[in-house]
Amino acid sequence: MKKFFAIAAAAVVLAACSGDRDHILKVYNWSDYIDESVIPEFEAWYEEQTGEPVKVIYQTFDINETMLSKIEKGHEDYDVVCPSDYIIERMLKSDLLLPLDRDFGSTPNYIDDNLSPYIRDCFNKIEGGGKNANDYSVGYMWGTTGILYNAKYVTDEEVSTWDVLRNPKFADKIFIKDSARDVFSQIIIYLHREDLAAGKVTLDELMLDSSDEAIAEVENFMKQVKPLVAGWEADFGKDQMTQERGWLSLNWSGDGVWAIEEAAEVGVDLRYSLPREGFTVWFDGWVIPKFAVNTKAAKYWINFMSRPDIVIRNVEVTGYVSVSGAPEVLEAFTDEEYDAIDLSYFFGAEADSVCVNPVLYPDRADIERSAQEHDWGERTPYLVAMWSRVKGESASGMTMIVVAVFIVALAAFGIYTKFFKNRKKARKRR
């Protein structure tokens, strides 16, 4: 219903302003991925900086491919959108993006002043068909893929390896992200752990391997995991973990932070592990599509979203981690509750021993075992087909029970204050 009214309101504004499109900024972002109070602040700030009025039309999506289809096939005139890393890669190769003009006149360039050098290097690795992704996109949020686990039932040693996913000890207590891309990447790393250790292959090479052999390897492993799986989930897995219906969950760090906090309130000890064999990092970033109309307001929007105070507010609301390496951001999330870790790779040399939640920001020693995923391009259908074979045509009885229990629980909670204290809802990132 909320989404319906948002779309209706946007339609009314667009109709009223159809003759003034140059003063409208159409933003297309993930659901629940921003502190929405910053939107009117941007409108006022933009007029202060440029002397021109602007009205933001803010719309949301839940699946990368939905957004991409609207732009690639429908030629929708969104001015700024926020796709994931592999979609940025695909859009670059398809010539769907405009280069980002970083000239803001007398307005500070918050983008280049605050972007973490680690994130800049990662965007340099995006396969853009000869184009540098840093010239066409600016990071927004980032995170890792790891294992969320219940320390009451699973030891730190057991969860230090991806092989824990096929441990029969945890039958019917394992939840797996319904994301072929993320699952494939973690498992191919595990399966080639010895080659990695021997220097016969690199993480980057594994992330670019979409061969039939690689697909078959992962499929074989996951078919061993399948009998132990309680559910293939897009979003409900973290809730099952907080309620102790699940003990292990292949999950994203943002969901991990959310689940750990919620579980602690009811006395459940959830933790997050980055297995020793390696893991992947992911990114979402702002881009200006080729069919954009108000490119000036679009670049100012990206600049505004890179301002440290706005960054902090968005992180606090969404639970995800910004790409900003600004000292104000580090200060905001420093917490003496945590042991000191080395974040010099992200915030600079002075951050070599800081007390920050390691689920939000991995230690340098961990990040050195990380890999960056890429778009599969024409090989994507083969990945999707493998995933369908792994899951099978129908859901297991346990999966159906879990879904039913989840739905009943939501109803009983009365959507629990805008669904668990206004924290993020389903975000089918991949």
Residue ranges of predicted features:
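Early extracytoplasmic/lumenal segment of secretory-pathway proteins
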Residues: S18-S94, A395-M400
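Ligand-binding pocket segment of bilobal, Venus flytrap-like solute-binding proteins
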Residues: F175-I176, V183, I187, L191-R271
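Periplasmic-binding protein-like
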Residues: P108-Y110, A216-K223, V266-K290
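Conserved C-terminal helix/tail region of periplasmic/extracytoplasmic solute-binding proteins
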Residues: S353-R430
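Hydrophobic h-region of N-terminal signal peptides that target proteins for export
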Residues: F5-S18
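Hinge/lid segment of periplasmic solute-binding proteins
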Residues: Q59, E65-L68, D85, E89-W142, ...
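Ligand-binding "clamshell"
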Residues: M91-L100, N132-N134, A259-L274, E337-I341
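Mature extracytoplasmic/periplasmic domains
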Residues: P289-D366, R427
